[in-house]
């Protein structure tokens, strides 16, 4: 019949079930068995006050959150979807004017859907950004220092023995430092200290 809305199926289920009882049925994504029928009379808490853990917002005609699903997802088609809790990996608020970070996640991720993506919470970059830029060492200085350290260890450890030579007192390294430069490298008129010229 023309003008009557067609009910939609839930996505990602091996046996799709139709969510009935609403004028505009919503879709629950990723659940094997949808627990809550959004916007229907069955989704409201019973009048006797029996608690229903699958209803997130009690006494609400349109509960938005699903509890107890193996991998809870955001309910699509809501004006302001809420974050689904009781999930190992909480989802980020999607299609919201003001998205918020995941709730209860040990590693929160970047807030998506905003004009300016925020810094990942709990990352090293976020800690450096909060610190004073004058007191924090520059990135180039740290990289240069690391490169010098790596290049030094590479040059010293390139010998077959693996250890760098240590100059001894009176050894050939010390004698080589005390020897004068060859005659063809001396500047004209330079004093020759080894011959007693001043």
UniProtKB/Swiss-Prot annotation:
<feature type="region of interest" description="13 x 9 AA approximate tandem-repeats of P-R-V-I-V-G-(S/T)-P-R">
    <location>
        <begin position="7"/>
        <end position="125"/>
    </location>
</feature>
<feature type="repeat" description="2">
    <location>
        <begin position="16"/>
        <end position="24"/>
    </location>
</feature>
<feature type="compositionally biased region" description="Low complexity">
    <location>
        <begin position="161"/>
        <end position="178"/>
    </location>
</feature>
<feature type="repeat" description="12">
    <location>
        <begin position="106"/>
        <end position="114"/>
    </location>
</feature>
<feature type="repeat" description="3">
    <location>
        <begin position="25"/>
        <end position="33"/>
    </location>
</feature>
<feature type="region of interest" description="Disordered">
    <location>
        <begin position="37"/>
        <end position="64"/>
    </location>
</feature>
<feature type="region of interest" description="Disordered">
    <location>
        <begin position="94"/>
        <end position="198"/>
    </location>
</feature>
<feature type="compositionally biased region" description="Basic and acidic residues">
    <location>
        <begin position="145"/>
        <end position="157"/>
    </location>
</feature>
<feature type="repeat" description="11">
    <location>
        <begin position="97"/>
        <end position="105"/>
    </location>
</feature>
<feature type="modified residue" description="Phosphothreonine">
    <location>
        <position position="69"/>
    </location>
</feature>
<feature type="modified residue" description="Phosphoserine">
    <location>
        <position position="96"/>
    </location>
</feature>
<feature type="modified residue" description="Phosphoserine">
    <location>
        <position position="87"/>
    </location>
</feature>
<feature type="modified residue" description="Phosphoserine">
    <location>
        <position position="123"/>
    </location>
</feature>
<feature type="modified residue" description="Phosphoserine">
    <location>
        <position position="13"/>
    </location>
</feature>
<feature type="repeat" description="5">
    <location>
        <begin position="43"/>
        <end position="51"/>
    </location>
</feature>
<protein>
    <recommendedName>
        <fullName>Ras-related protein Rab-34, isoform NARR</fullName>
    </recommendedName>
</protein>
<feature type="repeat" description="9">
    <location>
        <begin position="79"/>
        <end position="87"/>
    </location>
</feature>
<keyword id="KW-0677">Repeat</keyword>
<feature type="modified residue" description="Phosphoserine">
    <location>
        <position position="78"/>
    </location>
</feature>
<feature type="repeat" description="10">
    <location>
        <begin position="88"/>
        <end position="96"/>
    </location>
</feature>
<feature type="repeat" description="8">
    <location>
        <begin position="70"/>
        <end position="78"/>
    </location>
</feature>
<feature type="repeat" description="6">
    <location>
        <begin position="52"/>
        <end position="60"/>
    </location>
</feature>
<comment type="subunit">
    <text>May interact with EIF5A and ERF1.</text>
</comment>
<keyword id="KW-0597">Phosphoprotein</keyword>
<feature type="repeat" description="4">
    <location>
        <begin position="34"/>
        <end position="42"/>
    </location>
</feature>
<keyword id="KW-0539">Nucleus</keyword>
<feature type="repeat" description="1">
    <location>
        <begin position="7"/>
        <end position="15"/>
    </location>
</feature>
<feature type="repeat" description="7">
    <location>
        <begin position="61"/>
        <end position="69"/>
    </location>
</feature>
<feature type="compositionally biased region" description="Low complexity">
    <location>
        <begin position="94"/>
        <end position="121"/>
    </location>
</feature>
<dbReference type="GO" id="GO:0005730">
    <property type="term" value="C:nucleolus"/>
</dbReference>
<feature type="repeat" description="13">
    <location>
        <begin position="115"/>
        <end position="123"/>
    </location>
</feature>
């Amino acid at each position: 019949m023309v003008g009557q809305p067609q009910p939609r199926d839930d996505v990602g289920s091996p046996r799709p079930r139709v969510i009935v009882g609403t004028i505009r049925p919503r879709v629950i994504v990723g659940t094997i068995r949808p627990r809550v029928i959004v916007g229907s009379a069955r989704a409201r808490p019973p009048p006797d006050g029996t608690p229903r853990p699958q209803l997130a917002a009690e006494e609400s005609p349109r509960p938005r959150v699903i509890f107890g699903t193996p991998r809870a997802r955001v309910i699509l088609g809501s004006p302001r979807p809420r974050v689904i809790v009781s999930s190992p990996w909480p989802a980020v608020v999607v299609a919201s004017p003001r998205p918020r970070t995941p709730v209860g996640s040990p590693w929160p991720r970047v807030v998506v859907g905003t004009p300016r993506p925020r810094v990942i919470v709990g990352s090293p970059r976020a800690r450096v950004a909060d610190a004073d830029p004058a007191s924090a060492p520059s990135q180039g200085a740290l990289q240069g220092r690391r490169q010098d350290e790596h290049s030094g260890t590479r040059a010293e450890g390139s010998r077959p023995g693996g250890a760098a030579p240590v100059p001894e007192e009176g050894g050939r390294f010390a004698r080589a430092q005390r020897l004068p430069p060859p005659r063809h490298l001396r500047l004209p008129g330079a004093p020759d200290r080894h011959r007693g010229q001043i």
